[in-house]
Regions:
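N-terminal targeting signals for export/organelle localization
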Residues: 1-96, 239-241
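Short active-site neighborhood of thiol/selenol oxidoreductases, capturing the structured segment around
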Residues: 89-142
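Short, surface-exposed patches at the edges or C-terminal ends of soluble domains, predominantly
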Residues: 3, 50-62, 108, 141-148, ...
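Extracytoplasmic
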Residues: 70-72, 120-125, 154, 194
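Flexible, glycine-rich phosphate/dinucleotide-binding loops
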Residues: 84, 134, 163, 208, ...
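Structural microenvironment flanking redox-active thiols in thiol-disulfide oxidoreductases
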Residues: 122-173, 183-188, 239-243
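Thiol/disulfide oxidoreductase modules built on the thioredoxin-like
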Residues: 121-122, 171-175, 183-233, 243
Length: 243
């Protein structure tokens, strides 16, 4: 995003349209590579995914996600359906070097998934996932329940995701919830990612409401957690639409 570029400066429409909420820079097309180069690139991608899954699932960092009572760490990432490129902006203020040149909460635009923008609008259910194996299945579950919780802001971020593959995932599962791309895996440490998927629930304003789900839950469990989130948010004064 703002590392290395500002998403708001160079915006091009994505080929499939853009959800309301993505990061920056022109897309440069490389010259065609030899056949074996393509296979090598594919193999590298497979290896990267396997390494990521191994890191997240078989060697957890001892974390259980962001603890209740703490605020969701700020981030802004490109949307999978957009055309903007760049690393996740995780800066908490301007000019923080590798974290970002612009504070993440200020990175706004139609091709940017900004967690601050989401929790300003209502309660949040955020899924972090790796696009491999059964991990992305939770996105279909969230999509299925979203109409029953109109005030909740559902979103997902793919760790080191591939845009073309994510677009196919969005299309195949009929997703309307925004899906972002964390191309360099910055959210792994920031969100204390311990499993795949990891689903975090937060009040309006970004304070985490309950412990994260660290595996794919049943639909009944997911519905119950969303119901609890809405009820707890109302108890704190939120006046969203009825579920």
């Amino acid at each position: 995003m703002s590392r290395p570029e500002h998403p708001g400066e160079q915006v091009e429409d994505g080929e499939h349209g853009v959800p309301p909420a993505g990061v920056a820079g022109p897309v440069h097309h490389a010259a065609p590579s030899p056949r074996y180069g393509r296979y090598a690139g594919l193999l590298a991608l497979v290896i990267l995914v396997l390494i990521t899954i191994n890191t997240l699932v078989t060697k957890p960092n001892g974390s259980t996600g962001i603890q209740p009572g703490n605020r969701l760490p700020a981030f802004a990432v490109p949307l999978a359906l957009g055309s903007l490129n760049g690393a996740a902006d995780v800066a908490t203020a301007a000019d923080q070097g590798a974290a970002g040149r612009v504070a993440a909460c200020k990175e706004r635009g139609p091709q940017i998934l900004n967690i601050c923008q989401l929790y300003e609008q209502g309660p949040v259910a955020l899924a972090l996932f790796v696009d491999a194996g059964s991990c992305p299945a939770v996105l279909g579950d969230l999509q299925a329940l979203a109409p029953s919780f109109p005030g909740v802001r559902f979103a997902a971020v793919a760790i080191k995701g591939n845009r073309a593959q994510l677009r196919r995932l969005v299309a195949s599962r009929g997703l309307s919830l925004p899906v972002g791309i964390d191309s360099d895996g910055a959210l792994v440490a920031l969100y204390k990612l311990a499993s795949c998927p990891q689903v975090t629930f937060a009040y309006p304003g970004g304070i985490v409401q309950s412990r994260a789900l660290l595996s794919r839950p049943s639909l009944a469990t997911l519905r119950a957690r969303l119901t609890q989130l809405v009820a707890a948010a109302r108890a704190r004064g939120w006046r969203g639409p009825p579920a």
